[in-house]
């Protein structure tokens, strides 16, 4: 259930701090194609060179990667939008070879691991993204949120997930309803139902007029009222979800 409420680095590329992954913004494909073309052209025509090793007359061929870390990341994002996940993984890893501390490459690998259900890998990558970013880096908001969802989906470290989500809210004012939604799910799992309802209703109040966003929040309210045994509110949310599904 949490997989469509994580941030993706494709969202950050649009120039805002973030947009919700539902699913998803990306670097323009045309731009990505240009990068791919540049990579192929440069690899074939520019980066292949011969080094002669003195009087022995030996020669070796060395290929040099012409792309920088950020270009590998953009190319990885293009592959992700096309569903070519393994190629995306290769590009993110190439970015890390060029820049071992690049937080967005770690974040991209974390998201792919998360979607595959490889939560330990996702947790490690998200933690690396956080460690490699400055404490006041606004991108940390999405790193914190996604790490929170690892803890939610594995039902562990829920208090830590709460702390991370609260830190995300401080870094990203615009994403408030997303983090309120995440908090609502955390409180539901902690059986703090009053706090869960307050957070989810606040998220609903601040949600844009977007059916996907509204559906996610209402699904969480649906689960909350089911656990509470609140039949009236459960029925109300059921009808609302039917309307949103039309």
Model-predicted segments: where are they?
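Short coil turns that delineate tetratricopeptide repeat
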Residues: 66, 100, 134, 138, ...
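TPR alpha-solenoid repeat register
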Residues: 71, 105, 139, 143, ...
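Residue-level recognition of tetratricopeptide repeat
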Residues: 77, 111, 149-150, 185, ...
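Register position in tetratricopeptide repeats
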Residues: 81, 115-116, 153-154, 189, ...
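Alpha-helical adaptor scaffolds
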Residues: 135-198, 205
């Amino acid at each position: 259930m949490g997989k469509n409420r994580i941030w993706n680095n494709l969202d950050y590329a649009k120039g805002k701090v973030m947009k919700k992954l539902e699913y998803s913004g990306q670097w323009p494909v045309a731009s990505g194609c240009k990068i791919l073309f540049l990579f192929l052209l440069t690899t074939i025509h520019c980066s292949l060179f011969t080094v002669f090793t003195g009087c022995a007359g030996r020669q070796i061929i060395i290929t040099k990667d012409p792309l920088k870390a950020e270009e590998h990341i953009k190319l990885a994002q293009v592959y992700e939008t096309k569903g070519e996940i393994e190629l995306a993984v290769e590009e993110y890893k190439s970015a890390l070879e060029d820049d071992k501390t690049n937080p967005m490459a770690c974040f991209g690998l974390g998201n792919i691991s998360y979607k595959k259900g490889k939560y330990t890998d996702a947790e490690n990558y998200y933690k690396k993204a956080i460690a490699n970013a400055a404490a006041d880096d606004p991108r940390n908001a999405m790193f914190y949120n996604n790490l929170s969802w690892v803890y939610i989906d594995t039902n562990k470290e829920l208090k830590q997930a709460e702390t991370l989500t609260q830190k995300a809210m401080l870094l990203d004012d615009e994403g408030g309803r997303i983090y309120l939604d995440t908090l609502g799910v955390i409180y539901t799992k902690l059986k703090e139902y009053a706090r869960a309802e307050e957070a989810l209703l606040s998220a609903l109040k601040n949600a844009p007029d977007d059916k996907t966003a509204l559906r996610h929040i209402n699904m969480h309210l649906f689960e909350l009222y089911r656990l509470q045994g609140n039949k009236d509110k459960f029925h109300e949310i059921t009808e609302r979800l039917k309307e949103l599904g039309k």
